[in-house]
Protein backbone atom coordinates (compact mmCIF):
# COMPACT_ATOMS: atom_id res chain seq x y z
CA UNK A 1 0.00 0.00 0.00
CA UNK A 2 2.87 2.37 0.78
CA UNK A 3 4.35 1.95 -2.73
CA UNK A 4 1.15 3.00 -4.53
CA UNK A 5 1.47 6.22 -6.57
CA UNK A 6 -0.41 9.24 -5.25
CA UNK A 7 -2.89 11.23 -7.32
CA UNK A 8 -2.13 14.94 -6.95
CA UNK A 9 -5.06 16.66 -8.68
CA UNK A 10 -8.83 16.28 -9.04
CA UNK A 11 -8.38 15.67 -12.79
CA UNK A 12 -6.08 12.74 -12.05
CA UNK A 13 -8.64 11.36 -9.58
CA UNK A 14 -11.42 11.65 -12.21
CA UNK A 15 -9.23 9.82 -14.77
CA UNK A 16 -8.65 7.06 -12.19
CA UNK A 17 -12.39 6.77 -11.43
CA UNK A 18 -13.22 6.63 -15.17
CA UNK A 19 -10.79 3.72 -15.54
CA UNK A 20 -11.92 2.00 -12.33
CA UNK A 21 -15.69 2.49 -12.94
CA UNK A 22 -16.12 2.90 -16.74
CA UNK A 23 -19.90 2.31 -16.60
CA UNK A 24 -20.33 5.23 -14.20
CA UNK A 25 -17.61 7.85 -14.84
CA UNK A 26 -16.18 9.07 -18.15
CA UNK A 27 -13.00 11.02 -18.87
CA UNK A 28 -14.46 12.75 -21.94
CA UNK A 29 -17.74 13.19 -23.78
CA UNK A 30 -21.17 13.54 -22.20
CA UNK A 31 -21.31 12.26 -18.61
CA UNK A 32 -24.12 10.22 -17.05
CA UNK A 33 -25.93 11.56 -13.95
CA UNK A 34 -24.63 9.92 -10.77
CA UNK A 35 -26.58 8.14 -8.09
CA UNK A 36 -27.50 10.26 -5.06
CA UNK A 37 -25.17 9.25 -2.22
CA UNK A 38 -22.48 7.90 -4.55
CA UNK A 39 -19.76 9.56 -2.45
CA UNK A 40 -20.21 7.01 0.34
CA UNK A 41 -20.18 4.19 -2.22
CA UNK A 42 -16.83 5.50 -3.49
CA UNK A 43 -15.41 5.66 0.02
CA UNK A 44 -16.43 2.02 0.59
CA UNK A 45 -15.11 0.76 -2.76
CA UNK A 46 -11.82 2.63 -3.21
CA UNK A 47 -10.75 3.09 0.42
CA UNK A 48 -6.97 2.83 0.52
CA UNK A 49 -6.51 2.65 -3.26
CA UNK A 50 -4.02 5.11 -4.79
CA UNK A 51 -3.68 6.73 -1.33
CA UNK A 52 -6.97 8.55 -1.96
CA UNK A 53 -8.47 10.56 0.89
CA UNK A 54 -12.10 11.53 1.40
CA UNK A 55 -11.18 15.16 0.73
CA UNK A 56 -9.69 14.23 -2.66
CA UNK A 57 -12.76 12.19 -3.58
CA UNK A 58 -15.12 14.98 -2.54
CA UNK A 59 -13.15 17.61 -4.53
CA UNK A 60 -13.03 15.37 -7.61
CA UNK A 61 -16.79 14.72 -7.43
CA UNK A 62 -17.47 18.45 -7.10
CA UNK A 63 -15.33 19.21 -10.17
CA UNK A 64 -16.90 16.34 -12.15
CA UNK A 65 -20.53 17.28 -11.41
CA UNK A 66 -19.96 21.00 -12.11
CA UNK A 67 -18.34 20.43 -15.52
CA UNK A 68 -20.23 21.53 -18.62
CA UNK A 69 -20.33 18.01 -20.07
CA UNK A 70 -21.93 16.66 -16.88
CA UNK A 71 -24.49 19.49 -16.74
CA UNK A 72 -25.33 18.86 -20.42
CA UNK A 73 -26.15 15.26 -19.49
CA UNK A 74 -28.67 16.24 -16.79
CA UNK A 75 -31.82 16.13 -18.94
CA UNK A 76 -35.47 15.22 -18.30
CA UNK A 77 -36.02 11.47 -18.43
CA UNK A 78 -32.34 10.61 -17.90
CA UNK A 79 -31.58 7.83 -15.41
CA UNK A 80 -28.98 8.06 -12.66
CA UNK A 81 -26.41 5.24 -12.40
CA UNK A 82 -24.38 3.68 -9.60
CA UNK A 83 -20.69 2.75 -9.73
CA UNK A 84 -21.42 -0.36 -11.81
CA UNK A 85 -23.71 1.45 -14.26
CA UNK A 86 -26.95 0.09 -12.79
CA UNK A 87 -29.98 2.45 -13.05
CA UNK A 88 -30.91 4.24 -9.81
CA UNK A 89 -34.01 6.24 -10.69
CA UNK A 90 -34.83 9.09 -13.06
CA UNK A 91 -33.81 12.70 -12.52
CA UNK A 92 -36.51 14.89 -11.00
CA UNK A 93 -37.47 18.27 -12.46
CA UNK A 94 -35.80 20.21 -9.64
CA UNK A 95 -32.36 18.71 -10.33
CA UNK A 96 -32.75 19.27 -14.09
CA UNK A 97 -33.65 22.95 -13.57
CA UNK A 98 -30.75 23.43 -11.12
CA UNK A 99 -28.29 21.98 -13.66
CA UNK A 100 -29.69 24.21 -16.41
CA UNK A 101 -29.17 27.34 -14.29
CA UNK A 102 -25.62 26.28 -13.36
CA UNK A 103 -24.79 25.82 -17.05
CA UNK A 104 -26.22 29.25 -17.99
CA UNK A 105 -24.25 30.95 -15.20
CA UNK A 106 -21.03 29.21 -16.22
CA UNK A 107 -21.47 30.30 -19.85
CA UNK A 108 -22.24 33.87 -18.77
CA UNK A 109 -19.08 34.01 -16.64
CA UNK A 110 -16.97 32.83 -19.57
CA UNK A 111 -18.62 35.38 -21.87
CA UNK A 112 -17.96 38.21 -19.40
CA UNK A 113 -14.32 37.14 -19.01
CA UNK A 114 -13.84 37.05 -22.78
CA UNK A 115 -15.42 40.49 -23.17
CA UNK A 116 -13.07 41.89 -20.51
CA UNK A 117 -10.02 40.31 -22.17
CA UNK A 118 -11.03 41.66 -25.60
CA UNK A 119 -11.51 45.15 -24.12
CA UNK A 120 -8.01 45.03 -22.62
CA UNK A 121 -6.55 43.90 -25.95
CA UNK A 122 -8.29 46.76 -27.78
CA UNK A 123 -6.94 49.27 -25.24
CA UNK A 124 -3.40 47.90 -25.59
CA UNK A 125 -3.63 47.96 -29.41
CA UNK A 126 -4.95 51.54 -29.38
CA UNK A 127 -2.14 52.67 -27.07
CA UNK A 128 0.48 51.00 -29.28
CA UNK A 129 -1.04 52.60 -32.40
CA UNK A 130 -0.83 56.09 -30.91
CA UNK A 131 2.87 55.66 -30.16
CA UNK A 132 3.63 54.42 -33.69
CA UNK A 133 1.68 57.28 -35.33
CA UNK A 134 3.64 59.98 -33.48
CA UNK A 135 7.36 59.69 -34.54
CA UNK A 136 9.81 62.29 -33.28
CA UNK A 137 10.08 65.37 -35.51
CA UNK A 138 13.53 66.02 -36.91
CA UNK A 139 14.99 69.44 -36.13
CA UNK A 140 15.81 71.57 -39.13
CA UNK A 141 19.20 73.32 -39.02
CA UNK A 142 18.89 77.03 -38.24
CA UNK A 143 19.91 79.24 -41.16
CA UNK A 144 23.05 81.30 -40.50
CA UNK A 145 22.52 85.05 -40.77
CA UNK A 146 25.42 87.20 -42.03
CA UNK A 147 26.96 89.44 -39.39
CA UNK A 148 26.11 93.13 -39.70
CA UNK A 149 29.01 95.35 -40.70
CA UNK A 150 30.03 98.14 -38.38
CA UNK A 151 28.37 101.46 -39.24
CA UNK A 152 25.62 99.81 -41.31
CA UNK A 153 22.11 100.84 -40.55
CA UNK A 154 19.95 98.38 -38.67
CA UNK A 155 16.85 97.25 -40.44
CA UNK A 156 13.73 97.46 -38.36
CA UNK A 157 12.55 94.05 -37.24
CA UNK A 158 9.37 92.90 -38.89
CA UNK A 159 6.63 92.51 -36.35
CA UNK A 160 5.26 89.03 -36.07
CA UNK A 161 1.53 88.76 -36.61
CA UNK A 162 -0.32 88.05 -33.43
CA UNK A 163 -1.55 84.49 -33.54
CA UNK A 164 -4.86 83.74 -31.98
CA UNK A 165 -4.79 81.03 -29.41
CA UNK A 166 -6.59 77.92 -30.66
CA UNK A 167 -9.87 77.23 -29.02
CA UNK A 168 -9.67 74.43 -26.53
CA UNK A 169 -12.11 71.67 -27.23
CA UNK A 170 -13.55 70.27 -24.06
CA UNK A 171 -13.26 66.53 -23.86
CA UNK A 172 -16.55 64.76 -23.22
CA UNK A 173 -17.00 64.04 -19.56
CA UNK A 174 -16.57 60.41 -18.64
CA UNK A 175 -19.47 58.88 -16.85
CA UNK A 176 -18.55 58.44 -13.20
CA UNK A 177 -19.59 55.25 -11.41
CA UNK A 178 -19.71 54.49 -7.71
CA UNK A 179 -18.49 50.99 -6.78
CA UNK A 180 -20.71 48.74 -4.69
CA UNK A 181 -18.96 48.29 -1.34
CA UNK A 182 -21.57 46.25 0.51
CA UNK A 183 -23.78 43.79 -1.40
CA UNK A 184 -25.96 43.31 1.70
CA UNK A 185 -27.26 46.85 1.18
CA UNK A 186 -28.63 45.93 -2.26
CA UNK A 187 -32.29 45.03 -2.78
CA UNK A 188 -34.02 42.79 -5.30
CA UNK A 189 -35.17 44.81 -8.31
CA UNK A 190 -32.55 47.53 -7.77
CA UNK A 191 -30.93 48.89 -10.94
CA UNK A 192 -27.14 49.00 -11.21
CA UNK A 193 -24.37 48.33 -13.72
CA UNK A 194 -21.97 45.44 -14.39
CA UNK A 195 -18.41 46.37 -15.36
CA UNK A 196 -16.89 44.52 -18.33
CA UNK A 197 -13.49 46.06 -19.05
CA UNK A 198 -14.01 49.81 -19.64
CA UNK A 199 -17.72 49.36 -20.31
CA UNK A 200 -20.64 49.15 -17.88
CA UNK A 201 -23.81 47.25 -18.76
CA UNK A 202 -27.19 48.03 -17.21
CA UNK A 203 -28.55 45.26 -14.98
CA UNK A 204 -31.20 44.54 -12.33
CA UNK A 205 -30.65 42.68 -9.03
CA UNK A 206 -32.44 39.30 -8.97
CA UNK A 207 -30.92 37.69 -5.88
CA UNK A 208 -28.13 38.21 -3.34
CA UNK A 209 -26.15 34.97 -2.77
CA UNK A 210 -23.12 33.97 -0.77
CA UNK A 211 -21.04 33.90 -3.99
CA UNK A 212 -22.11 37.36 -5.16
CA UNK A 213 -25.16 39.01 -6.68
CA UNK A 214 -27.36 37.40 -9.34
CA UNK A 215 -28.31 40.07 -11.87
CA UNK A 216 -30.21 40.19 -15.14
CA UNK A 217 -28.81 42.15 -18.08
CA UNK A 218 -30.99 44.08 -20.52
CA UNK A 219 -30.38 41.24 -22.98
CA UNK A 220 -32.26 38.90 -20.63
CA UNK A 221 -29.17 36.95 -19.57
CA UNK A 222 -28.79 36.29 -15.84
CA UNK A 223 -25.46 35.72 -14.09
CA UNK A 224 -23.79 35.87 -10.68
CA UNK A 225 -21.32 38.79 -10.35
CA UNK A 226 -18.86 39.58 -7.55
CA UNK A 227 -19.11 42.93 -5.77
CA UNK A 228 -15.96 44.38 -7.38
CA UNK A 229 -17.65 44.21 -10.81
CA UNK A 230 -20.78 46.11 -9.68
CA UNK A 231 -21.24 49.89 -9.78
CA UNK A 232 -24.08 52.42 -9.53
Curated annotation (Swiss-Prot):
<dbReference type="InterPro" id="IPR023529">
    <property type="entry name" value="ProQ"/>
</dbReference>
<dbReference type="InterPro" id="IPR035236">
    <property type="entry name" value="ProQ_C"/>
</dbReference>
<keyword id="KW-0143">Chaperone</keyword>
<keyword id="KW-0694">RNA-binding</keyword>
<dbReference type="InterPro" id="IPR016103">
    <property type="entry name" value="ProQ/FinO"/>
</dbReference>
<dbReference type="GO" id="GO:0010608">
    <property type="term" value="P:post-transcriptional regulation of gene expression"/>
</dbReference>
<feature type="region of interest" description="Disordered">
    <location>
        <begin position="105"/>
        <end position="182"/>
    </location>
</feature>
<dbReference type="GO" id="GO:0033592">
    <property type="term" value="F:RNA strand annealing activity"/>
</dbReference>
<feature type="compositionally biased region" description="Basic and acidic residues">
    <location>
        <begin position="117"/>
        <end position="136"/>
    </location>
</feature>
<feature type="compositionally biased region" description="Basic and acidic residues">
    <location>
        <begin position="147"/>
        <end position="177"/>
    </location>
</feature>
<dbReference type="Pfam" id="PF17516">
    <property type="entry name" value="ProQ_C"/>
</dbReference>
<dbReference type="GO" id="GO:0005829">
    <property type="term" value="C:cytosol"/>
</dbReference>
<protein>
    <recommendedName>
        <fullName>RNA chaperone ProQ</fullName>
    </recommendedName>
</protein>
<keyword id="KW-0963">Cytoplasm</keyword>
<dbReference type="GO" id="GO:0034057">
    <property type="term" value="F:RNA strand-exchange activity"/>
</dbReference>
<dbReference type="InterPro" id="IPR036442">
    <property type="entry name" value="ProQ/FinO_sf"/>
</dbReference>
<comment type="function">
    <text>RNA chaperone with significant RNA binding, RNA strand exchange and RNA duplexing activities. May regulate ProP activity through an RNA-based, post-transcriptional mechanism.</text>
</comment>
<feature type="compositionally biased region" description="Basic residues">
    <location>
        <begin position="137"/>
        <end position="146"/>
    </location>
</feature>
<comment type="similarity">
    <text>Belongs to the ProQ family.</text>
</comment>
<dbReference type="Pfam" id="PF04352">
    <property type="entry name" value="ProQ"/>
</dbReference>
